Design a protein with these regions (language model features):
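Glycine-/proline-rich flexible loop or hinge segments
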Residues: 45-51, 70-76
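Histidine-anchored nucleotide/phosphate-binding helix
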Residues: 59-73
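Glycine/serine-rich phosphate-binding loop and adjoining beta1-alpha1 elements at the start
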Residues: 2-47, 78-188
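Short, glycine-rich nucleotide/cofactor-binding loops
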Residues: 51-60
């Protein structure tokens, strides 16, 4: 484990990184399709130069998705969509073992939650991944200066999709979003 990093991050405990890495690798062994995609992305680098801000559950499954995007050339900043589901060891491993900026601590309060979203947005994203539409909402309310950089995003939850559809109906949504919850692959 690397004990120092120049990456911007806010995690609970760097000493948890080794345990987090073990759990991420275990999850990876049960995600063979994602592993194949990562191999292809390592060769083709489809996300070279792309900055992604992701607001998702910080779990071993999400960690493997972030690793795939990084293998594809993306620069990533991940924050927690739900502080109560944050796995602190996973967050530590993403920072110290895999070089991904993470802003997440299990049990963080409301102010910390929104500070983490803003910290992830400081990457000046081209794409966003959201779970509940809080990141996209902040982009469209208090971080509007970043909107010209964002070309697209995806939303994982039904609640987030409802919020996005209302934003689109009101003419407030400034970039296209994929409703992951509506895709056939989510319901296989």
């Amino acid at each position: 484990m690397t004990t120092t990093t120049s990456l911007k991050h806010d995690i609970a405990n760097p000493a948890l990184a080794a345990e987090g890495k073990k759990r991420i690798e275990w999850a990876e062994r049960n995600m063979p399709v994602l592993a194949q995609i990562r191999e292809r992305f390592e060769r083709n680098k489809p996300f070279n130069g792309v900055r992604i801000a992701a607001c998702m559950h910080v779990t071993t499954e999400t960690a493997n998705l972030m690793r795939v995007l990084k293998a594809g050339g993306a620069e990533i900043a991940l924050c927690a969509s739900n502080p109560l589901s944050t796995q602190d060891d996973t967050a530590a491993a993403l920072v110290y073992e895999y070089g991904i900026s993470v802003f997440a601590r299990n049990g963080v309060d409301r102010d910390g939650y929104y500070a983490h979203i803003n910290a992830a947005l400081d990457i000046k994203p081209n794409q966003v991944f959201d779970d509940g539409c809080d990141l996209v909402n902040i982009l469209h309310t208090t971080r509007k200066e970043l909107l010209p950089n964002v070309v697209a995003g995806c939303e994982e939850t039904t609640t987030g999709v409802i919020r996005l559809r209302q934003m689109a109906k009101d003419g407030a949504l400034t970039f296209p979003m994929v409703a992951v919850n509506d895709t056939d692959t989510k319901h296989m």
